[in-house]
Each structure stands twice: as structure tokens, then as C-alpha cells.
Amino acid sequence: MARKTPLNRIRNIGIAAHIDAGKTTTSERILFYTGVSHKIGEVHDGAATMDWMEQEKERGITITSAATTCFWKDHQINLIDTPGHVDFTIEVERSMRVLDGAVSVFCSVGGVQPQSETVWRQANKYGVPRIVFVNKMDRIGANFYNVENQIKLRLKANPVPINIPIGAEDTFIGVIDLVQMKAIVWNNETMGAKYDVEEIPSDLLEKAKEYREKLVEAVAEQDEALMEKYLGGEELSIEEIKKGIKAGCLNMSLVPMLCGSSFKNKGVQTLLDAVIDYLPAPTEVVDIKGIDPKTEEEVFVKSSDDGEFAGLAFKIMTDPFVGQLTFVRVYRGKLESGSYVYNSTKDKKERVGRLLKMHSNKREDIKEVYAGEICAFVGLKDTLTGDTLCDEKNAVVLERMEFPEPVIHIAVEPKTKADQEKMGVALGKLAEEDPSFRVMTQEETGQTLIGGMGELHLEIIVDRLKREFKVEAEIGQPQVAFRETIRSSVSKEHKYAKQSGGRGQYGHVFIKLEPKEPGSGYEFVNEISGGVIPKEYIPAVDKGIQEAMQNGVLAGYPVVDFKVTLYDGSYHDVDSSEMAFKIAGSMAFKEASRAANPVLLEPMMKVEVEVPEEYMGDVIGDLNRRRGQINSMDDRLGLKIVNAFVPLVEMFGYSTDLRSATQGRGTYSMEFDHYGEVPSNIAKEIVEKRKG
């Protein structure tokens, strides 16, 4: 079976936005106009095709990025719907990794919200070109030009409108296409499927000319030949303008900007045209960096059908009918269903039972998959998110994705003995799907703890236990993931010796313990010379320290951000062993930690609160009571915006308190920012309670 769509006519795009900007509705309309869904799914009635998990239907937010394939004007668009809630940034980060381009949806009233900034930063990090769609132009307070300004100020980007609205709020009827200099007016009777191309209304002609001039100027800057033409007063052709917009979009010096109202079926076709015209094909993005596992040298994977198969697993889902689905972005070559692939990250071979093209949650079996495609593999046992799948003879490891550590834990207790067994299996499956979700057992109590990125994240996990796995569980109070670190440098020696007849134990080490920059992690340096400790025992010292650092000396929390230098020691020909050096390393570390001024760290959250002015004083007072540090105060659309760092431990139940303090008019968002030192009086309480 030959490839149906040439590689240069494929677009892998994500739709990313703040919660409630209308992202799922936009995806739905794309599927409707490209002929995939016959009845448009509305988020309001919980029937959206993309939002297919039960919880998403209830909450009306998108949780897992469903990958869907659709066609528009001889192009294949692989659409990845990404969640807009802060607790799910891991999903967004994952999909950014495998996209070639993105559509950023903004609400014409709300503009640039905190989550939009996070998603924008992630797209910058992965170098993803994007176009902006200003949605909800029919809403009261809609203002396209306000959003344009906010993108400049808050996102430090260069938005270049390629169409501008005709009317706003209930008079919004269409857009002016600045490339063609025509008005496009949608027909309400056909649910926006038909539209008329007309002359620009006379009252908007001046504005259209002004914005067309800005567009042409931005385009001319992309190319010397175009610049000369522009400065010489010559008209640029439509083709030249399109070429210039695409060049600027791909090098990220400009962001094409469009508007519409997905809910009212206006502006979606022009958005699809822009996706095809301006976002990159897999052949137009930079080659993917990888490492040759044999030589550890850097290699580059070029997107093409030639060459051996290489792809990246970027998402795992459990499907009630098919079992485990592994979503893979194919970068090079092709693969047939039923064949074997090599997982170069795990050094294991796996058989691909079936290949599925996904349409939201309907599926189509395909025989083979080609470069540039996104496809679900069935039958992989050992592959996890971030693993590379490739041809064994031409192995490559594509760059890994980084996943954040959980900042919040909750104890879960199964209600019955039968639930106990099912719960272990279910949590294991959920942890495979979501690398930012962790499961652990608390040693002292034997309780199962689940960890994640926020309260909503864990609520949804518990909810899925109930619905998908039929496990009833009680949940405890949320617990914060504290850490410990040291503030001063100390040198210590420890001799571990048991020599009373028979085979003894002997390990003797000198270590230096030093604090490191926040967030820099653990470092072990071996400075042993002259063989005072044999080479084979040195990893044991490191291992002993790594085990001991899981339980800090203050309150048993993991110790972070420090460096250990092993610089001296001694050994015994007969009695020394790896075990003895492991114990010596562990004891030396514990003694050194006690003397190195240990302190407790807590997760600090970046909190942004939006409130009407009259509640501002109360909100700031409340944040101060929660040990918050206020960073800035801004105005946005008649509301006051307060930015602060607040300890996570003080933020439990904040949504309820904020609602009652502002009569339901305040909203907030928070995301983990960094670990900060706990004030000594509070640290003392935490330590006593923990040791209680």
C-alpha cells in the first residue's frame, strides 16, 4: 500500500490554549468542516468528539490529548487536542514535542491568560511555529485589537494579523482577508459551511489598508528581494505575501493572527487555509536530534520515507476494547503492522500487533505507517512515554522528554479486600499513561500514596479508578512533597568495621558535603587517588549516599541539591566488601548532613489571582496570611491581577475561600515554580508533627 498523502502535504498540529478559550469547540468545527463528524459535538452538552473521557464530558475540560486525522484541500492534518488546565501541562509538553506547528487559541474577551503564557513558553522551548486564532468574536466585550496588544506585551511576540474582524459581539459577521483584500461573510443558514467573498465594506476600508500595510511591511522584512521591491514602491503579489508570511512563521519572527467564532461557525475555514499555507510540513522543520546508542555520538534524523524506521512514543492510553495504545510520531521510514520494532531506550524488541489511525475515539486499522504520521501502536508491552522505537541495525535514541516531580501527595485506601488487589493494577496502568503521576508506598505506615501536579490532577485519577477500573477508594488529606537540603559545607569520616572472628566487614571513607544551586540536583565526585579505596567499591559509596538521601535527617524527606566528594579512606584485603562501603557511605552522609545546617524546603507555587478592584485588599491580605510574597499587580480588562509566590501547603481549599471572599467573581490559577526554604518556626512544627 503506497503512501496516500505526500510528506510535504502533511501537517502535524496541536491546538493549544487557556481553559475556556474555546479550544475543543475549535477542534470540533475543524472535524465538522473537514467532513469527519456529521453532528457537531458541543462542549456545552458534553458530546464533543475530542473530549472522549467521561470526566472530560462532565467537567467540560480536555484532559488527554486525542490525536485525530482529517483532510482539507488535498492535505492531511493530524490534529492533537491539548488540555488547557495547569495541572495537565505535562500533556501539553508531551504533545509539543511531537508537533510541527500549533494553533494558539485565545478568547477575544479574556485575552492572554496565565495558562496561555505557560503553553506559549513550552512552544518556544520546543521551537514550534504557531498561528494565533482569536476566538469568541461574538461574545460581549470581544476585542481583537486588545488581544493583539496583549500578545505583544505579555508574550513578547510579534503578532501580524492576516485577517481582521467585520463587526464584533452580536454584529460579528465575517472577516477581511488582508492577503486577498476581500471580505468573507459567513452564511448562518448552512451553519457556516458556505460563505460569500465580497468587497470590503467602505467603513472598514481605511482600517483594512492600515493593517494590510503592516502585513506587507512584516513580510518584506523576511527577504531582501521582497524588501527591495517594497521600498521601491512596487506591489507584492499574493504568492509573495504568502511566501513571506510562511517564512516568518517558520523562523518564528512573526505570528500570523486570525479571528473568528468557532461556536457560531465563523472563521474556521480561513483558519484551516492558514494551517496549510503557513504551518510547516514535516520536511520543513529542523532535523530531530538523537544519539547513537553504540557510540553515544549526536546524530540527526531527517524526516523522510527513505531510511530506516524511527519514531517517538509520546503517549500511552488504555483503551477498553483494544488494550494499551501507544501513540507514536514517525520521523523516518515506514513500518508495517505485524512487524518487530526495537526500543532503543530500553534495549528491547517488541512486536507491533496492529496499527490504528485514530479519529478521536473511533479507530481505523491501517497496514503501514509512514514518516510524518501520528499513529497508535497496539501490542507493545515495555514501551513508555518518551521511548524511541526504531530499526535495530540503525539504532538511534531521540532526545528524552523531561517530566516534573509531583508536588502533592494523597493517601489512597481501598475500601475492601477485593479493591486492594484491583487498585495496585489500576494505579500501575495509570502511572504508565501519565509520567507526572507517581505511586509509592509510605514505609512507616504501609499506606499507598499517589503524587501529582495539583489537586485536580489527583481528583481525576481517583475518579478514573472508580469509573474505568471499578475500584472504590477512600482518600486522605493532601500532603505536600517537602524536601531537605543543606546550607553549609562539612567534611566527615566514617569507619564501618565489624571484625570479631570469621569474615568481617570493613569500609572506611572520608567525604566532603557541599550545598549546590537550587534545582541542580545531586552530584558525586570521586577524588580517590593511589588506590586507597579500590575502584570496584566506589560505586557502592555513591549508592549508599543515594539510598540515605531518600530519608533526610530533619524529618525523613528526600535531600536535594548537594555535592559529595569522596576524597580519602582505607580498606581491608579480606573484610572489605561492597556492602561495607555502602554502609560507610550512608553513615558518613547522615553524620555530615546533621552538621551541615540542614533546612526544610517546600514547593512554592506561582499564583495569579484575577479580582474586581473592590476585593483587591481582602485578597492581598489573605495571600499575606498564607505566607505569600506579592510580586506584581496589574490591570487587565477592568480587573486587578495579583501575582504572588505562595507555599503550596497554604493553598489547600483556596478556591472555596476565594469564591466566598469575592462572591464568586475572583478566579485564580497556580503552577509549581520552585522550592523555597520553610521559615524555622513553621519547619519546627512540621518536623515535630512528622516525628510525632
From Swiss-Prot:
The keyword Transferase does not apply. It is found in: Cytoplasm. GTP binds at residues 17-24, 81-85, 135-138. The keyword Nucleotide-binding applies. One of its GO terms (cellular component) is cytoplasm. SMART domains: EFG_C (SM00838), EFG_IV (SM00889). Pfam families: EFG_C (PF00679), EFG_III (PF14492), EFG_IV (PF03764), GTP_EFTU (PF00009), GTP_EFTU_D2 (PF03144). Residues 8-283 form the tr-type G domain. Catalyzes the GTP-dependent ribosomal translocation step during translation elongation. During this step, the ribosome changes from the pre-translocational (PRE) to the post-translocational (POST) state as the newly formed A-site-bound peptidyl-tRNA and P-site-bound deacylated tRNA move to the P and E sites, respectively. Catalyzes the coordinated movement of the two tRNA molecules, the mRNA and conformational changes in the ribosome. Belongs to the TRAFAC class translation factor GTPase superfamily. Classic translation factor GTPase family. EF-G/EF-2 subfamily. This is Elongation factor G. The lineage of its organism: Bacteria, Pseudomonadati, Campylobacterota, Epsilonproteobacteria, Campylobacterales.
